[in-house]
Amino acid sequence: MNNLLNIKSFLKFLGKNKAYTVIDVFGLSVSLMFVILISIYTVQELSVDKFQEHGDRIYAVAYEEGVVTGVPVAYRLQERYPEIERVCPVISNNFNSMIVWANDKKMNANLCFADSSFFNFFSFKLLSGDKNRVLQARNNAVISRTFANKLFGTDDPVGQSIRISDSTSVMVTGVMEDIKNSAIPYTDLLLRIEGVTEFNGSLGMDRYNNAGATTAFLMMKPGADLRPKTDDIATYMKEFFWPYKMELWKKVILIPMNELYFSPIKGNGNSGDKRFVIVLMSVGILILIFAVFNYINLTVAQAGQRAKEMATRRLLGSSRGELFMRLMVESTSLTVISFILGLLFAMAVTS
């Protein structure tokens, strides 16, 4: 009952001091909004690919300046090095805005080509279909949830045919959750890598001439580490891969999947800047500190008026403990109100 009376009295005080209320609540709310937005962004950035079940065993093959290679390279490395359990070359960001047709609808789609083991290799969620069979045949395709809704609406897309750029038809065998929070870019359609030649003649299972389109992912056997053998891999590459034969590329670098997004060596996938994230986190902390100091300064500015009120209440019989609890309830209420407003502001911005 006393707490309710305290809150009621505090609301009267805020009503009498509208300028103080607006500056204090609005200032703290806006500051908390920025802190919330920065926190959401930094958490998202720092959690990229952390959901990958085998992330500690997956590496991307790179050279000094790029996380790129030829389509067959991953398979050649698997044949030679027993440390490798399986491989999954991925071609992304090379076939964006391709025209597709289905159910008399014509749309643009982002295509991605990968090894048939894609869903056993990575931990991307399949909403329908068997991860061991969805890419079993050359003309199989897995469609993203968002693109399935755009193209087929409420109809079940599995078993439906999609025509791509007048030349190729594929059958939808599965629906996957949208790829996000990963170094691997979002894609509308995931196709088998064996079919990439139909869209680009320089790419193929036996074609090395296009060296900048593919990301070769290697999964090591438990406990195995191929990184000490990178010099040997570079020497081996000279036997069959022209950039190494011509000494345009000299080194082989194996980048762990968990570090790929923030790697200074970029490729065809998504990437981030860890220094920017750290700077942004620092800015968020500074904003929070300034907000707290601003709140304290405004509270101190009202100290004289509040001291008279507290003295009057002390004379009327309130104990020190009751006055302390009153101030705590007031401060907590103001902070909670500001946080709720800051959260609503942040939701409005993100929406």
State each model region's role.
Residues 1-20, 52, 224-227, 232-284, ...:
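Membrane-helix entry/capping segments
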Residues 4-23, 27, 293-334:
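Intracellular coupling helices
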Residues 17-44:
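Short, strongly hydrophobic transmembrane alpha-helices
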Residues 112-128, 141-272:
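Mid-to-C-terminal secondary-structure elements
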Residues 38-97, 112, 205-217, 230-232, ...:
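Membrane-proximal extracellular/periplasmic loop immediately following the first transmembrane helix
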